Amino acid sequence: MPTVSVKRDLLFQALGRTYTDEEFDELCFEFGLELDEITSEKEIISKEQGNVKAAGASDVVLYKIDVPANRYDLLCLEGLVRGLQVFKERIKAPVYKRVMPDGKIQKLIITEETAKIRPFAVAAVLRNIKFTKDRYDSFIELQEKLHQNICRKRALVAIGTHDLDTLSGPFTYTAKRPSDIKFKPLNKTKEYTACELMNIYKTDNHLKHYLHIIENKPLYPVIYDSNGVVLSMPPIINGDHSRITVNTRNIFIECTGTDFTKAKIVLDIIVTMFSEYCENQFTVEAAEVVFPNGKSHTFPELAYRKEMVRADLINKKVGIRETPENLAKLLTRMYLKSEVIGDGNQIEIEIPPTRADIIHACDIVEDAAIAYGYSNIQMTLPKTYTIANQFPLNKLTELLRHDMAAAGFTEALTFALCSQEDIADKLGVDISATKAVHISSPKTAEFQVARTTLLPGLLKTIAANRKMPLPLKLFEISDIVIKDSNTDVGAKNYRHLCAVYYNKNPGFEIIHGLLDRIMQLLDVLPGEDKGGYVIKASEGPAFFPGRCAEIFARGQSVGKLGVLHPDVITKFELTMPCSSLEINIGPFL
């Protein structure tokens, strides 16, 4: 979830009242948000860089608020305040309007060359806006939040904001060879070619993460005004000539990208959030975008649409019994202007341009549940019998895990996938004899097959912890996978218990004693009768000759124990003797 940092006092001033930390935390919870942290700029720097670096930093209290990833309208102070005020019914949701300019409309002309790299662009103008330092900071921060969220780190959409009074339209969005693009980028003192900029920004902590988007392309996107002044080279950097400041009065906004829908959403969010500060509140000046095919379209769309949802559907999905009128009121509090129409069971909802997250009826139902309050929904027993019970094999696993730990062994959780070498070559077995399930297109050599034994995972864990004090006593109780043509999926899982003892001496007696303890816990007595267990001398390629035994219990073979062969130990990069035990616990249910 994205986190929005807002100044507490500025937030309370905008909300028109002061809250205690506990009260504001409760308000956030009611609105479906979470107050994640109460901190300050000084405290943040102190934690990350130390007290010396924090000297002189601001002590202003900051609220860090977790916002749902699809609520782009809450990524800045303006949207957050507006949403909370509507939720508390202190104000009505504003109506956003697109207006035509008094004079000539600003045009953005897209050329055919952009189709090879970033084919889409939209634009708009915020006219007669009044910034303060805090408003300006919020404007810049919203762009960054959108870049990291819906824009997918500028891969889908990149935002450019420019001082319109320093430019002359119409504007041209085209693509050129890097060597043909030259301009003075933001915060630089001289001009550079695009090639030079890409080299410079490879060491820039902020911009280096975006270079890969275009650096290997033959053409780079660029936007010019009618005088040939570069506005920006999206998605990397804006030009310094048109940089905006606190004193900027007219802003030209362009959004370029590879996703047309998201570009329109991003533009709508920016202009709706900050048109509040325009001379004519909540009005946005239109801009015309001319596409390569000659067709033109006016942006921003600021489209309102209406959806119909039945009241009984909301009640059923949420588990409440509210009248259609009350449900309409709840939805209106969530920035979704609603009214009851028709037969009295239909609710008409107006979706504003700020709520791009409303895609389906279930999104409307969710907002109704939030406004009603999850804590107010009564707990009820389901109409169908759905009482769960623990799976017997998992219950046995949990009991054994606790007792293995009580015996002094440390639990390890290893990957279910491994390399062919781990389960075959290193254990002295041919891969065809393992009945392993193979991954058709493994992304790495470490994940080629599903494990057929837990032993390699534990030995690799020991290898990664060789510096730890001896002895190392590890165990794992997890599934292995074996091919089985008799099952519908062609494979079957078996729950295995594996334990290893690694020390200067093999410690076979410790592993043997552990086996006796496990059988005692499973209520299996020693003996060759049908209900007992016995170990018999055996051989295995992974074990030292004459130091291996097969375990029989309840009339069947359930596993092996013994001292590992020196070759196995060496192949897993170990240097000390090691004993192991591995059994199938399924037959003991």
From Swiss-Prot:
The gene is FARSB. It comes from Pongo abelii. The keyword Oxidoreductase does not apply. Mg(2+) binds at D357, D363, E366, D367. It is found in: Cytoplasm. Coiled coil: none annotated. This is Phenylalanine--tRNA ligase beta subunit. It catalyses: tRNA(Phe) + L-phenylalanine + ATP = L-phenylalanyl-tRNA(Phe) + AMP + diphosphate + H(+). SMART domains: B3_4, B5. Keywords: Aminoacyl-tRNA synthetase, ATP-binding, Cytoplasm, Ligase, Magnesium, Metal-binding, Nucleotide-binding, Protein biosynthesis. Belongs to the phenylalanyl-tRNA synthetase beta subunit family. Type 2 subfamily. Its EC number is 6.1.1.20. Its cofactor is Mg(2+). Gene3D superfamilies: 3.30.56.10, Bira Bifunctional Protein, Domain 2, Phenylalanyl-trna Synthetase, Chain B, domain 3. GO terms for biological process: phenylalanyl-tRNA aminoacylation; protein heterotetramerization. Residues 302-379 form the B5 domain. Heterotetramer; dimer of two heterodimers formed by FARSA and FARSB. Pfam families: B3_4 (PF03483), B5 (PF03484), PhetRS_B1 (PF18262), tRNA_synthFbeta (PF17759). GO terms for cellular component: phenylalanine-tRNA ligase complex.
